[in-house]
Amino acid sequence: MSKRPAPDPVSVLRGHRASVADICFHPSNSILFSGSTDGELRIWNTVQYRTVSSAWVHSAAHGIICVAASPVLGDNKVISQGRDGTVKCWDFGGGGLSRTPLLTIKTNSYHFCKLSIAKSPSEAMKIDDLEVNEIVDGMQREEQGDQPTDSIKFKGKELIEGPKYVAIAGEQASVVEIWDVNTAERIAQLPHSSGSPSNQTPNQRGMCMAVQAFLPSESQGLLSIMAGYEDGSIAWWDLRNLGVPLTSVKFHSEPVLSLCIDGSCKGGLSGAADEKILMFALDHSMGSCLIRKEIVLERPGIAGTSIRPDGKIAATAGWDHRVRIYNYRKGKPLAILKYHNATCNTVSFSADSKLLASASEDTTVALWELYLPRT
């Protein structure tokens, strides 16, 4: 049986003068945001494949490490995160950004960990629930004991109409912080510092390298955080206990570089500096994180991961310049996309699941059409 050749990109967006560190699609319009390491934020029309607007939003010395848009923020806002210790929220209207940010959060965090806007389960997610009992891969769970708990509860409706929360690696690089984008206030730290000896664990994990914030329907309004660390471990916090994670697993032998939670909030994907891509399942009743598929690569280094909103396709961005496409349900490889001639930094799917974007150190953004969803 002959294999079909991998497709070429439908378009390549050129305009950045430095490595494109991050990209994200607008939640409802044909717009793509991209941020580069020289501090430039570009807005692209993904129908006409042209720049709509560009602005220098962080200093060239520090650059952008993350751009984020979400239904939680609304249609007219986008967030940029720089290595200058700031997160800025911008108004996006009339084809361009506001001259000044609506709000600036001074996190004093100087690192490469991209922030995460809290998300709720997607209605577009049609993937069948994973049968966790059928997963045979083992995992190690930390015993929490009967410690007093501090909990923060966020209702799903509040995320749309009230406070907007982001998770970010903190001023102490091993600590995850939760911030309210509306007020620029820090509302939680993970772990919550109480001066007890048990709080030594995060430092042993090293720096927080990747983070995802989500609001699973099973959590009764409790925000969950997945954090990947320098030692290859991943911790799941559910904020009922700010001192100790719900569980901690070590699937990787090198620093975790990327995490993505799927639209059902029942599983996800991780990439690291080692040669493995891991698809995992979250059992909310047991508080466990279990491997359901381990993919071993010929060359190490996965800088970015993304899962399509419909839950069918997953993509990874590799140090080897390649974009890899997988069947997310089965974990089977589908294609290797070859366009970029330098490290691929990140990948992102559009909200309608019709486009995939990849960004690279070669200063370009490639747009791909793959396995289009049924309409």
From Swiss-Prot:
Annotated knockout phenotype:
Reduced plasmodesmata (PD)-mediated horizontal and vertical cell-to-cell transport in leaves.
Fetch the SUPFAM superfamilies from UniProt: WD40 repeat-like
Where the WD repeats fall, as residue ranges, is 15-54, 59-100, 144-189, 203-247, 251-290, 297-338, 339-375
Principal localisation: cytoplasm
**Compartments, as annotated in UniProt:** Cytoplasm; Nucleus
Q: Which InterPro entries match?
A: G-protein_beta_WD-40_rep (IPR020472), WD40/YVTN_repeat-like_dom_sf (IPR015943), WD40_repeat_CS (IPR019775), WD40_repeat_dom_sf (IPR036322), WD40_rpt (IPR001680)
Biological process GO terms, please? DNA damage response; plant ovule development; plasmodesma organization; plasmodesmata-mediated intercellular transport; pollen development; regulation of cell cycle; regulation of DNA repair; response to aluminum ion
The answer on whether this UniProt entry bears the keyword Ribosomal protein reads: no
A single cellular component GO annotation: nucleus
The cross-references to Gene3D superfamilies, in alphabetical order and at most eight, read: YVTN repeat-like/Quinoprotein amine dehydrogenase
Per UniProt, the keywords (alphabetical) are: Cell cycle, Cytoplasm, Developmental protein, DNA damage, Nucleus, Repeat, WD repeat
Tell me the domain of life.
Eukaryota
Show the disulfide pairing.
none
* Family membership noted in the UniProt record: Belongs to the plant DSE1 protein family.
Q: What does this protein do?
A: Involved in the formation of X-, Y-shaped and twinned plasmodesmata (PD), thus modelating PD size exclusion limit and regulating cell-to-cell transport. Cell cycle checkpoint regulator that monitors and responds to DNA damage such as DNA cross-links, and triggers the halt of the cell cycle progression in the presence of DNA cross-linking agents. Mediates the active process of aluminum- (Al) dependent root growth inhibition and thus is required for response to Al toxicity. Essential for signal transduction and development of both male and female organs.
Q: What protein name does the entry list?
A: Protein DECREASED SIZE EXCLUSION LIMIT 1
Supply the gene name: DSE1
